[in-house]
A protein has these predicted regions:
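Inward-facing hydrophobic residues that define packing positions of alpha-helical scaffold repeats
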Residues: 34, 41, 81, 87-88
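Amphipathic alpha-helical binding modules
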Residues: 27, 104-148
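Tryptophan (W) side chains
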Residues: 9-11
Length: 148
């Protein structure tokens, strides 16, 4: 009887390991989908490969967009991811490609975060993907649901 319990315990552990591995693969796929969507939006609207919003070396040279980028990245890194996204959405300037690249870079920054960090701060890869889709729609790119 003890052998069966032991076998059952081993089987349950292996099942848990498989489930954990499946979740890891699912997260990897979702992360890859996010990168692909960001790349597609960038190619369609910014004529580049991947968004790479960068800040000037001197803070005195910051534009409004630069200040927003620094703020939202800082908030996200401090764990206020939802607050960072709200700040981004409230301060986006329509039809300004700098703000589009800023937002795309922001979502890719979130995508680079560990899934546990995202979970701990009430955020998910699905929300990142939803944010990218919404951003794309605001810029006239529709039909991304079919890709994911």
């Amino acid at each position: 009887m003890q052998i069966r319990r032991s076998e059952k315990w081993v089987w349950q552990n292996r099942t848990a390991e498989r489930e954990e591995n499946d979740l890891g693969l699912q997260d990897d796929r979702m992360s890859g989908n996010i990168q692909d969507i960001a790349r597609l939006i960038t190619r369609l609207l910014l004529k580049g490969d991947m968004p790479q919003y960068t800040l000037p070396a001197a803070e005195a040279d910051y534009t409004e967009a630069d200040q927003l980028f620094k703020k939202v990245i800082g908030l996200a890194d401090e764990g206020d991811i939802n607050g960072a996204e709200n700040e981004l959405l409230m301060n986006m300037k329509e039809d300004d490609p700098d703000y589009l690249e800023l937002a795309l870079t922001f979502y890719l920054h979130l995508n680079d975060m560990d899934v546990d960090y995202l979970d701990d701060h009430d955020y998910s890869r699905e929300e990142i993907l939803d944010g990218l889709k919404s951003l794309a729609e605001d810029w006239g790119v529709t039909g991304l649901e079919a890709l994911v």
